[in-house]
Amino acid sequence: MTSRIAVTSAPILPVLAKRWSPRSLDASYEISDQDLLSIVEAGRWAPSAMNVQPWRFSVAKRGSELFGKIASHLGGFNASWSPKSSAYVVVSAFTNGDSGQPGTTSQFDSGISAGHILIQAEALGLHGHVMGGIDHVALHTELGYPENLAVLVVIAIGKGAPAELLEGGAYDREVAMRSRLPLDEIVLHGLPNA
């Protein structure tokens, strides 16, 4: 499997530097219930404004009926590679709080929760790949969610496989150098000097 450790401008935790989102996944790997529980438990312990915890998860292991239903609502390229993943985690968020007013931080908090899921998967020697290319409305209906629970993303969880298993452009994307915008482009004010 391709090593994808980030080249950073300042030291970061090794688990963060190693985290990446492969598309080449081992279709024979079966995730344990304990690892999957650990992954969603990490999501549960994300910080949350006023401790509202607006996130909700639907979890499906490959081979289950729910996994197939989720896969049927993935769009384009995601539909070609992600069914090889060991599990899907649908991350959703309530759009209003107890007050009945729109929750201004619910999607933000749920994004942090998704980040926790990704980092826990990486710590377990697995990978998570966030997919926004989904039919949100159809998946919402399929899952029987209430109107005020919005589907945000689906995360494919699995064990990495050699990039050579991918073809064409997918292979090229898998082995390309990882990059991020430099800090001086994303820190608008107060970037510390190194």
Residue ranges and their predicted role:
Residues M1-A194:
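Acidic, surface-exposed loops and disordered segments
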